[in-house]
Regions:
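Contiguous transmembrane helix-bundle modules in multi-pass membrane proteins
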Residues: 188-194, 198, 208-212, 349-515, ...
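Membrane-embedded helix bundles of polyisoprenyl
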Residues: 35-37, 128-142, 146-231, 244-264, ...
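Active-site lumenal/periplasmic loops and adjacent helix-entry segments of GT-C-fold
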Residues: 45-143, 147-177, 284-325, 753
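Hydrophobic alpha-helical membrane-insertion signals
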Residues: 15-94, 267-270, 502-505, 509-555, ...
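Start-transfer (signal-anchor) and selected internal transmembrane alpha helices
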Residues: 1-48, 237-249, 471-485, 802-819
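Active-site-proximal, structured, solvent-exposed surfaces of multi-pass membrane proteins
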Residues: 69, 690-819
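Extracytoplasmic/lumenal acceptor-recognition loop(s) of multi-pass membrane glycoenzymes
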Residues: 88, 93, 485-513, 524-604, ...
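Periplasmic/ER-lumenal interhelical loops and adjacent helix-loop junctions
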Residues: 60-84, 242, 249-344, 369-374, ...
Length: 819
């Protein structure tokens, strides 16, 4: 393909042949070696197993979220195979969506839960290495020199998004994914080869399709920039390029079919995706051109200089918190180099650089545009910070290349930029804020003096070296010094983010603390003595982090009632809302659900047979509802006296309208007598008695005999389970008259019921759970779960493969490779 003309101000000179350029294609191995070198020293205590890559501070998601998440999948795959439904996700949920949130974690899942948590750091470093490698080839696709490509690769591999993101287990893959999309874009743009772009879209779709929007926004602007960087605007060619991207992207989307559909519908059908997001109206109605306050702006500025200059972990003094504040650090040298691009390119080309920079800087000054970038779903930075870093890296690498080619540095731009950053790093940032409790206060950023001194010192050194690149006749030694400084800076700055934290040590895994506490012996005892299906609630947390761990059951392999899930099963949440377990008006409450531990009557109704506690006196009700059956260390095992099986029957019902009028305790008590039906379902209740408001009782009328008699009545005609597994339940029931059977798991369209061998629809009971209408007599019950979109998704996959095959055939016919 004929290369477009370069639009530079100064005629290009020949790059001086030196060590870096003489390496040729082998320069990749130098870049790779440097990535591995820096990664080792940044993460050495974790790689050498002195510490475990888990954090007890604000990064507690590694302990409370991601570790239980992947441990559960690994355990599930070993016992059940392909992920479908799990009773350990809340009180039951399909888990195919989210299975490949980070496809590289499949390594840990297939090795097994015993590999966790020690294996996580190796997977993360592997992702950094692969992401950096892909970005190197992207740099070379832009025709940069070997030296500039190596510098750019290192800046990318150890930018703030990559390193802080690694401490959240999520963002290293997302950085890798975008690097692949950028390389794929260049392959389409330059050589009409679409495979890598399709692969990038495929990986995004099986991981988290929502990212396709943010990636798409970046590619949209980057694609226009690249086209106009090298061509005059030509409508046919311009939109033809986007047409190729859409076609290549469509192939990737189609091939991802089963995961794409499952992921999309999990989001859409969750509380977060189906409405009630308290943030949307607030953010969408905020003033468009309201500026960031001083602390918000200062945090953005300071975290461009270093991710940890405002403190690490819980000592962070900026807005939000250490993980969710802006983190656009991408090497100090990039902050000085990027201003050099403007005097070294033509006026016509300069306007496109300025336009791209304004597009990505605007949300830093005007938060409304950052909210819009996230579709007003939250006050996030994350990918936005990363994209801003990428623009800085691209500009600085191009500027470095031009300096090396032309041996010219604009001294005014260099000194002005240096002074600007020295001033920005030194001034005070404070502003009035309103705390969540409504109180007013003043927040002031506090910088780490050691890191701040290092930053200013290196800014000055970099400025001197950049100046010398444009003046010295022999710049090879300067290039060596500059590269050594970049390697040292990235190692020094990055190690704070991972190491200056509250960390789980290797010794912790051997002590009877954290997830290795006496809960293990307690659960083992229960399982040895009870082979049936049951649920367990805990009144304490095992995780050991600053935030309580409500997904202990995923690590200790038992079924509970709590959930930590951004996209929880909607009927599970509706049930919790209906019984006032969580705030029905707060969407955030749907992501962190403590379960039924504080509601003993609901525990009885939902097959919570055991409670683990360290303080029996914590809930006086337990003295009447449970027996203490064992103790291990400081953990007491309580067994319910009033446990109901998985399925039991009601002969009474109460309408949803009447139920909603009851107090919290009345709701619990009435559910011991009647199930709750929607008003639309009332016409199908032939032969059943309706319970009205006058039939309900108050707490002062409650007796323990009332509880015993109610439980005995419900249990009298209940499901006798013959087979129970995650995806299949078989049993028998005999009822004396028409009744409603309550099954204590959320109603889901993936469950298929056969009543006496005939396909039968389940009904919604108690505002979220599964119900069946058994008529008088004996019945066989067969329930099977099938991922709803697996078959439809496989059809999309076949269509995608067919289209890809057609593309491959015609490209082969025209002697054009696809890769």
């Amino acid at each position: 393909m004929k290369q477009p003309k370069t639009k530079e101000t100064i005629p290009s000179q020949t790059i001086v042949s030196d060590f870096f350029e003489n390496l040729g294609n082998k320069s990749y191995f130098l870049a790779l070696s440097l990535i591995i070198f820096i990664a080792f020293f940044v993460f050495k205590d974790f790689l050498l197993l002195k510490n475990v890559f888990q954090f007890k501070d604000i990064g507690s998601d590694t302990l409370n979220g991601m570790y239980p998440y992947y441990h559960h999948y690994a355990d599930y795959i070993q016992k059940n195979g392909w992920p479908q439904w799990s009773f350990a996700e809340g009180m039951g949920q399909g888990i195919l969506s989210g299975f490949l949130r980070d496809p590289f974690q499949l390594i840990a899942m297939l090795i097994g839960p015993q590999s966790m948590p020690k294996i996580f750091i190796y997977i993360i470093v592997l992702e950094i290495i692969i992401a950096g490698s892909i970005f190197y080839f992207f740099m070379k696709a832009l025709k940069t020199t070997n030296y500039s490509a190596i510098i750019g690769t290192l800046l990318f591999s150890f930018c703030g998004f990559m390193i802080i993101g690694s401490c959240w287990y999520l963002f290293t893959f997302e950085a890798l994914n975008l690097a692949l999309l950028l390389l794929g874009f260049e392959r389409i743009y330059q050589k009409n080869k679409w495979f890598l772009f399709s692969l990038g879209i495929f990986l995004a779709a099986i991981s988290f399709p929502v990212n396709l929007f943010t990636y798409g926004v970046f590619i949209l602007f980057y694609g226009a920039f690249r086209f106009l960087q090298e061509n005059d605007f030509d409508k046919k060619k311009f939109f033809g390029l986007y047409g190729k991207l859409i076609m290549a992207g469509a192939i990737g989307l189609l091939i991802s079919g089963p995961f794409l559909l499952e992921n999309i519908f999990q989001v859409l059908e969750s509380p977060r995706g189906s409405g009630g997001d308290s943030y949307f109206d607030k953010l969408a109605n905020s003033p468009m051109f309201a500026t960031s306050n001083k602390v918000e702006f200062g945090t953005s500025v300071m975290r461009m200089l270093s991710s940890d200059i405002l403190g690490s972990g819980n000592s962070f003094s900026g807005i939000q918190n250490f993980l969710e504040a802006p983190f656009s650090y991408c090497g100090l040298i990039s902050l000085l180099l990027m201003s050099q691009i403007f005097p070294l390119i033509s006026k016509n080309l300069r306007k496109w650089y300025i336009a791209l920079l304004i597009i990505w800087l605007t949300p830093t000054f005007f938060p409304y545009f950052r909210y819009a970038f996230w579709l007003f779903s939250g006050d996030y930075y994350r990918a936005y910070s990363f994209f801003l870093s990428l623009v800085f890296i691209l500009f600085s690498v191009h500027a470095l290349d031009l300096i090396l080619k032309h041996k010219k540095v604009n001294l005014i731009a260099l000194i002005s930029t240096l002074i600007l950053w020295l001033i920005l790093s030194s001034i005070s940032y404070k502003s009035n804020i309103t705390y969540p409790n409504g109180q007013q206060g003043i927040q002031e950023l506090k910088s780490d003096d050691t890191i701040a001194f290092f930053v200013r010192l290196f800014l000055v050194f970099y400025a001197i070296l950049i100046f010398m690149l444009g003046k010295s006749k022999n710049i090879t030694n300067i290039k060596y010094i500059l590269l050594i400084m970049v390697v040292f800076e990235l190692t020094y700055i990055s190690q704070f983010s991972a190491n200056r934290r509250s960390i789980v040590s290797a010794r912790d895994l051997k002590e009877k603390i954290g997830y290795n506490d006496y809960s293990i012996e307690a659960i083992k005892y229960i399982k040895e003595n009870d082979k049936s299906f049951f649920r367990v609630d805990k009144s304490y947390f095992s995780g050991g982090a600053m935030h309580g761990s409500i997904t202990d059951h995923k690590v200790h392999s038992y079924y509970g009632t709590s959930s930590y899930n951004s996209f929880a099963q909607i009927n599970y949440i509706n049930y919790m809302r209906a019984y006032n377990v969580i705030d029905k008006n707060n969407e955030f409450a749907s992501r962190w659900v403590d379960g039924l531990i504080s509601r003993p009557f609901l525990e009885s109704l939902n097959h919570v047979k055991y409670v683990l506690t360290k303080e029996v006196s914590k809930n006086p009700v337990w003295l009447n509802t449970h027996d203490s059956v064992a103790k291990f260390g400081d953990v007491v095992v309580l067994k319910s006296k009033f446990n109901l099986p998985l399925g039991y029957t009601y002969n009474q019902y109460i309408s949803q309208t009447d139920f909603d009028l009851l107090s919290t305790i009345q709701k619990d008590l009435v559910s011991l007598k009647a199930c709750v039906l929607s008003d639309q379902e009332l016409s199908n209740t032939i032969g059943l008695k309706r319970l009205t408001l006058k039939d309900t009782i108050e707490l002062n009328q409650f007796t323990w005999n009332y509880l015993k008699n109610s439980v005995d009545s419900l249990k009298n005609e209940s499901l006798k389970t013959v087979l129970f597994s995650e995806n299949k339940i078989e049993g028998n029931i005999s009822v004396s008259k028409n009744k409603i059977m309550y099954l204590s798991f959320p109603k889901d369209k993936g469950w298929h019921l056969k009543l006496d061998g005939k396909e039968t629809e389940t009904i919604l009971v108690n505002n979220g759970m599964t119900g069946i209408y058994p008529s008088s007599g004996k019945h066989s019950i067969n329930l099977e779960y099938h991922s709803r979109f697996l078959n439809k998704g496989l059809i999309l996959t076949l269509v995608g493969i067919l289209i890809a095959g057609i593309f491959w055939f015609f490209n082969r016919k025209n002697k054009v490779a696809i890769i």
